[in-house]
Amino acid sequence: RLNDLLKAITQHYIDRGYVTSRAYLPQQDLADGELDVIVVEGRLEGVEGSAIASDRELALASPAQTGEPLNLRELEQLVEQINRLPSRPAELELVPGSDVGGSRVQLKGEPGKPWRVGFNRHNDGQRSTGEQQWGASLEWDSPLGLADQLSLRAGGDAVSDRWRHSANQSFAYSLPYGWWSFSYAYSQSYYRMRTQGQGFPFVSDGESKTHQLRADRVLHRDSISKTGLSLGLAHLETRNYIENALLGSSSPRITETQLGFNHGRRLGSAFVNLDLGWQQGIGALDAKNSRIDGKSGTNARYDKYSLTASYLQPFQLLGENLSFDSLINYQRSEDELNSPQRISIGGLSSVRGFKDQSLSGNSGGYWRNQLRWTRPVDWAPLQPFVRQYGLAFAYDLGQIQGDRNNARSHGRLSGNALEFSARGPNLAVSLTFARSLERPDVIERQEHPIYARIDLFY
């Protein structure tokens, strides 16, 4: 019974991450009817990063403190912060320390190239602003030696003319600090398109700029789950023109606060993730007044609520590797939102099967489902270029609720798709054949889009 008691006490510590703590019975006289149990709380004597991380990077990324009881959850957080850099595949190893119950942590792994460049070409653009699109990216791990990350991206239409053009650029930077992660992102975009009015063509163009600050905090983690909270502040400025005349009613300046909750969990071999969000428009940073446009009634002091839930289940059938994934994205607002805050469905990233036609509204959502089969390439001459190929079948559906600004443009969309894909060390290609199924009357025609994409990366 005493052994069972000691095991229970030790297990209590282990379940909370104190894997080097142990309970034992010292020599004692039980004549007084009291039992003394001593717990040796294993201490952390230090963390060694070797080539995978410098001392400065470890100091920022690790919530664990030397001399404190060793907690595996803190060390898992450290490894996760380092592993978020693709060039730092770190693994954890505990080695005995110099003191009784003490342990040292060694991070094992070989660092890779700290930067990555990528180029892509696809046809997922809009016909009005350029269907054929290109993109380029640069990622740099730990540019300041702080386990930080820098990302630069740019893209645009591959064929421009007087009537059609689009371009976009973005910058992102993230910095870890123990249980926290801080990030800043900036993006800007420009479009030019042809519009028709009273039988005459006009040039319509516009630009948008977005700044976002965000802080993420891990609240709890154990061997199968992680829970976190995020706080953010975003500022968006949009300017739209017709023949160089500013359209004030559709050119808002919006500032919003963001509060998010995240919970991820492993269920057997499956993975489940839940994100809840609340966004509120405020008047800071020169945001416009509550009523931006008296005609449309769009509101810059809005409240918007969002939910995203995902499920991934890998499995094998008859010796083949398969996976099923499902994602639900939903938002709701009782306020009239400007276009950037509204939810849109119809396209490769929401309801496949639609490309030139879509629905948007204050409230709505979509549900994506996909069954994927993958197989490694066995033919040796092809392996330097392609390591894996696969096939996926998808079925998506979405719903937009009616509101003041879309009395007709609401309803339900659904579509399916068949995707062929291949991937190698420096190459990824995909070809997707999609078909629209359900659509409301406002969506005038059925679509059969074909999405093609090629990515080169180094």
Short names for language-model regions:
Residues 101, 130-134, 165-169, 207-211, ...:
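Residues that define the transmembrane beta-barrel architecture of outer-membrane proteins
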Residues 239-397, 401, 444:
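C-terminal outer-membrane beta-barrel translocator/porin domains of Gram-negative envelope proteins
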Residues 109, 140-142, 175, 217-219, ...:
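Residue-level signature of outer-membrane beta-barrel architecture
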Residues 1-125, 155-167, 327-328:
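Periplasmic polypeptide-binding modules associated with outer-membrane biogenesis and secretion
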Residues 115-117, 144-150, 178-184, 222-227, ...:
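Repeated loop/turn-to-beta-strand initiation elements of outer-membrane beta-barrel proteins
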Residues 138, 213, 309, 420-427, ...:
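Outer-membrane beta-barrel "beta-signal"
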Residues 67, 122-124, 157-159, 196-203, ...:
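Extracellular loop and loop/strand-boundary signature of outer-membrane beta-barrel proteins
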Residues 94, 119-123, 150-156, 171, ...:
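Transmembrane beta-barrel strands of outer-membrane/channel proteins
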